[in-house]
Amino acid sequence: MMLPLQGAQMLQMLEKSLRKSLPASLKVYGTVFHINHGNPFNLKAVVDKWPDFNTVVVCPQEQDMTDDLDHYTNTYQIYSKDPQNCQEFLGSPELINWKQHLQIQSSQPSLNEAIQNLAAIKSFKVKQTQRILYMAAETAKELTPFLLKSKILSPNGGKPKAINQEMFKLSSMDVTHAHLVNKFWHFGGNERSQRFIERCIQTFPTCCLLGPEGTPVCWDLMDQTGEMRMAGTLPEYRLHGLVTYVIYSHAQKLGKLGFPVYSHVDYSNEAMQKMSYTLQHVPIPRSWNQWNCVPL
């Protein structure tokens, strides 16, 4: 059975229910949170049953997924209370179009088995990417206080070093800056990623530092799941703590709007892990997962 959730009441109940399953449900919780705040990406939430759902899938409307090669748009966020038994639901052709290039995102590494099994059945190849998920301390305090029990947060800690404000000006990104983000984004560098970046800039709060030329030298964006993403710094401005300043400022901005604040870092990116530690972001290992699926 497949049940699209209609109306504000159902979606608010879903958000409340997902909140009880954090941090395992974070990627879906963040997406549903923004569906309930105007749904700027025009997404839908589908469950296997209601109200006692086992699995929830959030994805774009069918009419928005017309490009079979655009996995940036053809993206599904998934949370399951029963990852071992969600394979049948995920395999339903009305739910996920396995003939497209697509990506699945989840805070649950345990979904891997179901996705790998489906790859064999539906004949597509799958590449899993796993990263460290970080939650801002303020968000963790509100949503998952148990994650902070063993953490000692200094009351005035978590702030970046001051920057030269004569030289750099805090600002927001403009859609004309998308090419810059696309050039340095690990998952980007193509025409479809450029369109996705443009949409994120037009839709969600962004943050950047403008350099002496009045153009961005460092930036941070947000995606449809509410995650801070695509941070970058021009090579000649690296190692000056600018990205720490931008991410701190962006997190403050999102926090003031009442948004859950979280991000991810590659296991090999020690500089960004150190930065997350400086800003007192709370690490949740193995909790950022993406599966890129390509039909054979």
Curated annotation (Swiss-Prot):
Pfam family, one: Gly_acyl_tr_C
Tissue specificity: Predominantly expressed in liver (at protein level) and kidney. Down-regulated in hepatocellular carcinoma and other liver cancers.
Domain of life: Eukaryota
One GO BP annotation of this record: xenobiotic metabolic process
Coiled coil: none
EC number(s) from the headed UniProt entry: 2.3.1.13, 2.3.1.71
Subcellular location: Mitochondrion
Gene3D superfamilies: 3.40.630.30
InterPro entries the record matches: Acyl_CoA_acyltransferase (IPR016181), Glycine_N-acyltransferase (IPR010313), Glycine_N-acyltransferase_C (IPR013652), Glycine_N-acyltransferase_N (IPR015938)
GO cellular component: mitochondrial matrix; mitochondrion
Reaction(s) the record says it catalyses: an acyl-CoA + glycine = an N-acylglycine + CoA + H(+); benzoyl-CoA + glycine = N-benzoylglycine + CoA + H(+)
GO molecular function annotation: acyltransferase activity; glycine N-acyltransferase activity; glycine N-benzoyltransferase activity
Positions of post-translational N6-succinyllysine modification: K16, K127, K141, K169, K183, K256
List of residues that carry N6-acetyllysine: K16, K127, K141, K159, K183, K256
SUPFAM superfamilies in the record: Acyl-CoA N-acyltransferases (Nat)
Protein family (similarity comment): Belongs to the glycine N-acyltransferase family.
Function: Mitochondrial acyltransferase which transfers an acyl group to the N-terminus of glycine and glutamine, although much less efficiently. Can conjugate numerous substrates to form a variety of N-acylglycines, with a preference for benzoyl-CoA over phenylacetyl-CoA as acyl donors. Thereby detoxify xenobiotics, such as benzoic acid or salicylic acid, and endogenous organic acids, such as isovaleric acid.
Name listed for the protein in its UniProt record: Glycine N-acyltransferase
